[in-house]
């Protein structure tokens, strides 16, 4: 039986620490704590309206994916990992991760409510799993690999790393290109916070696979899971580019295809198995965006000092800060 799943009936408290490396991962995650209200999107509204319609359509598809994906991650943490795992230090990490994923989910909802005032269009995005076949397909794939009745713990951790890494990564990179255009500062700030968090989540899954999982999946199974994730990302990116009529400034879908393969090979390395694609990085400027090397600058400077409500909606009241100097 896996060590992570063995109950220690004699242990009721977290101290004394028995798994210091896992505890350090938890403390690292704890240090990144933030809230969804800490980002100002007031400037983004004008940028969004000025954005060409095809480009807006591309980013709408990304938002539709994000609002669904984080809820599925939360579902897996609450119904599977947090019920099964018995090592307290690991359980602390996943408890903190679940809280972070709730912040991410709220942040994506704020983004949709801020940028898309039409309620019917908002609902189409919030109902992404029903309105977008590829998003539904991705959700089904995640649930398939997270099923504890069909997959070992090792297989599920590989799948979880693929979700937190592969399924999210291209979308993070696409949003980050808005920073190069000097637009959408709030969306970019959210993206930097969330991508950094997800990098730690993904890296921790790889750490557990390499250091705690006794029945590590065969390399061919790891490759199968990762390649399936890449194929889903390809399908989603093609769908999003079709919605944008192929016109998104800064990158092509072929560049995103290559990047996700480069990223996946690095994930293979972290899981101590052979690379699959052997391709270079088409976005060398995004090196810091890889896993837990996400840009950390200005995190504390972005903490709010003043607040303003950007969306006039009593049923969805949230406050956003004003300090122009933060950008």
From Swiss-Prot:
InterPro entries: Ferritin-like_SF, RNR-like, RNR_small, RNR_small_AS, RNR_small_fam. The keyword Cell membrane does not apply. Ribonucleoside-diphosphate reductase holoenzyme provides the precursors necessary for viral DNA synthesis. Allows virus growth in non-dividing cells. Catalyzes the biosynthesis of deoxyribonucleotides from the corresponding ribonucleotides. Its cofactor is Fe cation. Induction: Expressed in the early phase of the viral replicative cycle. Heterotetramer composed of a homodimer of the large subunit (R1) and a homodimer of the small subunit (R2). Larger multisubunit protein complex are also active, composed of (R1)n(R2)n. Signal peptide: none annotated. PROSITE patterns: RIBORED_SMALL. Binds 2 iron ions per subunit. Coiled coil: none annotated. Belongs to the ribonucleoside diphosphate reductase small chain family. This is Ribonucleoside-diphosphate reductase small chain. GO terms for biological process: deoxyribonucleotide biosynthetic process. It comes from African swine fever virus (isolate Warthog/Namibia/Wart80/1980) (ASFV). GO terms for molecular function: metal ion binding; ribonucleoside-diphosphate reductase activity, thioredoxin disulfide as acceptor. Keywords: Deoxyribonucleotide synthesis, Early protein, Iron, Metal-binding, Oxidoreductase. Fe cation 1 binds at residues 70, 101, 104. It comes from the Viruses. The active site is at residue 108.
